[in-house]
């Protein structure tokens, strides 16, 4: 039986590349994305067209903030791994619309953690951000550096998701890996990162 992987944010830049890599290796992937309009939705649609060429890929449009919808889809698919990359991105936009960050990044991640706990996921991987290092003056950053002073609302939500994930991992023994992405660029990248 093929390993099943559930990827949130699968139409996003990082999610697309992760999904494609696992599909190319023969895994079954269920992708979820809200297809929000933070940047041109056509770019997300074009990424999805490529993923949909794989017979082992299925996609559902939806929000991670909707736990009933999310739980229904995840339980039906029954993955052994969840890769949680969905998030409201962008530091500048977090000043204009902090509610979007609270809902997507914190509530959405809480929902992913709850579902991971309920289905006893074998491994949970969560995308975070280098912005959690905030006002840290030491350079270059290391994983062991302090992350106590975020300087944007976006960074504060990403640090909050790390804390929630650590708590869930400790309390319910959910094997969890958190990845702190720095500026990510490449083919099919976000236009605001150019």
Which stretches of residues belong to each language-model region?
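N-terminal Rossmann-like NAD(P)+-binding domain of SDR-like oxidoreductases, especially those catalyzing
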Residues: 1-184
């Amino acid at each position: 039986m093929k390993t099943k992987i559930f990827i949130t944010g699968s139409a996003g830049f990082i999610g697309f590349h992760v999904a494609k890599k696992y599909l190319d290796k023969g895994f079954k992937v269920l992708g979820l994305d809200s297809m929000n309009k933070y940047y041109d939705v056509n770019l997300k649609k074009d990424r999805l067209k490529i993923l949909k060429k794989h017979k082992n890929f299925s996609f559902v449009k939806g929000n991670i903030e909707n736990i009933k919808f999310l739980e229904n889809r995840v339980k039906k698919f029954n993955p052994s791994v969840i890769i949680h990359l969905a998030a409201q991105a962008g530091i500048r936009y977090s000043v204009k619309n902090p509610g979007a960050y609270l809902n997507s990044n914190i509530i959405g991640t809480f929902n992913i953690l709850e579902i991971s706990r309920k289905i006893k996921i074998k491994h949970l991987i969560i995308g975070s951000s280098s912005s959690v290092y905030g006002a840290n003056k030491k350079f270059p950053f290391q994983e062991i550096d302090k992350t106590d002073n975020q300087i944007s609302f976006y960074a504060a939500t990403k640090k909050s998701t790390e804390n929630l994930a650590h708590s869930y991992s400790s309390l319910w023994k959910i094997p969890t890996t958190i990845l702190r992405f720095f500026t990510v660029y490449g083919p099919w990248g976000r236009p605001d990162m150019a």
